[in-house]
From Swiss-Prot:
Main location: cytoplasm
Gene that produces this protein: rsmH
Catalytic activity from the UniProt record: cytidine(1402) in 16S rRNA + S-adenosyl-L-methionine = N(4)-methylcytidine(1402) in 16S rRNA + S-adenosyl-L-homocysteine + H(+)
Name assigned to this protein: Ribosomal RNA small subunit methyltransferase H
The entry's keywords: Cytoplasm, Methyltransferase, rRNA processing, S-adenosyl-L-methionine, Transferase
């Protein structure tokens, strides 16, 4: 058992998310964020021998768990990488259309609670923050070279931090004296420059969130995968997404809204809306949030929102099909 496996992970909205997929015994499903396999194992329990489950994850520790599962269950295929490679990965596995795809966005509890990963200001550790520790630039490496303006924009846009400019200026001043290479060093700089405190929230929360999102390209990947899933879903197939903060939830909400209704017609158009093809998606029920009992058992579930869409027989607009090639 690796060190990360000693950290307790509670899958959020477990039954609700898998129920939303309406799993068919012979279906093909994708878990785009395997984590420690909570959603995947429940999907597998509902699949028959002819079913398949493809799981994605960037994190090498999560992939180790996924590969162990795949060795004991031949229905499982494993992809070590971000879900933005959705279509390319499915092509490589010889899979065409799928019956459903589930995404549990953001950071997992094992990643937060393993101090060595550098995601949390609760531990003094190397400032890494990469979900995939085998590739890419760490948070410390980026902070060492980013311009003050880039630091400000990332912290403001991805963390919605009011004091982003002051924090960016302080980072640039501090790194001129010594490297900012640990979580504690960064947290101390932020704390000294956030003038007002939010009740129950550490002053470093927004800055750490912002840098993590940027380093891992989290919002770009969400925006990239949604049209790919829409293109690959069978008619009646389901897309289920759990988001934990407003930035990623807004992307999902706007995407589903856009493709579940017709674009407004100009007044001069010689066609009625009723004569247009059916939109490619329809919203499947209202957005769901965890109940009081789940939040009491797992306070980190508090901000979760589950949105579900279903593929219709409607055609997919050409521009959406073109967008899917950008990440292939």
């Amino acid at each position: 058992m690796s060190g990360a496996e000693s950290y307790r992970h509670i899958t959020v909205l477990l039954n609700e998310a898998v129920d939303a997929l309406a799993v068919r015994e012979d279906g093909v499903y994708v878990d785009g964020t395997f984590g420690r396999g909570g959603h995947s194992r429940l999907i597998l329990s509902r699949l028959g021998d002819a079913g398949r489950l493809i799981v994605f994850d960037k994190d090498p520790q999560a992939i180790a768990v996924a590969e162990e599962l795949a060795r004991s269950d031949k229905r499982v295929g494993v992809v070590h990488g971000g879900f933005a490679s959705f279509q390319t990965a499915l092509d490589g596995l010889g899979i065409g259309k799928v019956d459903g795809a589930l995404f549990d966005l953001g950071i997992s509890s094992p990643q937060i609670d393993d101090g060595s990963r550098g995601f949390s200001f609760r531990f003094d550790a190397p400032l890494d923050m990469r979900m995939d520790t085998t590739r890419g630039m760490s948070a410390a490496e980026w902070i060492a070279v980013a311009s003050e303006q880039d630091l400000h924009e990332v912290i403001k846009n991805y963390g919605e931090e009011r004091f982003s400019r002051q924090i960016a200026r302080a980072i640039v001043a501090q790194r001129a004296e010594s490297p900012i290479d640990t979580t504690r060093k960064l947290a101390q700089i932020v704390a000294q420059n956030v003038r007002t405190r939010e009740r129950g929230q550490d002053p470093a929360t927004r800055t750490f969130q912002a840098i993590r999102i940027f380093i891992n390209r989290e919002l770009e990947e969400v925006g990239a995968v949604l049209p790919q899933v829409m293109c690959r879903l069978k008619e009646g197939g389901r897309l289920a997404v759990i988001a934990f903060h407003s930035l990623e939830d807004r992307i999902v909400k706007q995407f589903v809204k856009k493709y579940s209704q017709h674009a407004p017609l100009p007044r001069w158009a010689a066609v009625r809306e009723a004569d247009l093809p059916e939109p490619p998606l329809k919203i499947a029920g209202r957005a769901l949030k965890p109940g009081e009992a789940e939040i009491a058992a797992n306070p980190r579930a508090r901000s979760a929102v589950l949105r579900v869409a279903e593929r219709t027989a409607g055609p997919i607009p050409e521009q959406s099909q073109r967008k899917t090639s950008e990440w292939q």
